[in-house]
């Protein structure tokens, strides 16, 4: 991805999606996350960002902690995540 973007003259990619997918979430249905395991998602997102940087493309990981639990896409509707701070820290911010 990084090489292709660099060859096209792109120097910033609003990626990777670093959200931890929740059961039945829009991001999981759309295949837009690296999975449901926080540690695996962190490793994959870090590797993706490193690959971009190696080609001279800056990475901007997204979205916000908890968004992986959203049932609808933020492209289609506003989303409210009703998780406690402890729940976010325990799953989405490890």
Residues of each region from the PLM?
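Glycoside hydrolase catalytic-domain context in secreted enzymes
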Residues: 1-94
């Amino acid at each position: 991805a990084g090489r292709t973007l660099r060859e096209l003259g792109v120097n910033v990619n609003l990626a990777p999606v670093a959200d931890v997918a929740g059961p039945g979430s829009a991001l999981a249905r759309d295949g837009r996350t690296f999975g449901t395991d926080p540690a695996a998602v962190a490793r994959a997102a870090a590797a993706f960002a490193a690959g971009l940087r190696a080609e001279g493309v800056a990475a901007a990981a997204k979205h916000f902690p908890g968004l992986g639990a959203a049932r609808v896409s933020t492209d289609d509707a506003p989303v409210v995540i009703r998780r406690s701070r402890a729940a976010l820290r325990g799953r989405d911010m490890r």
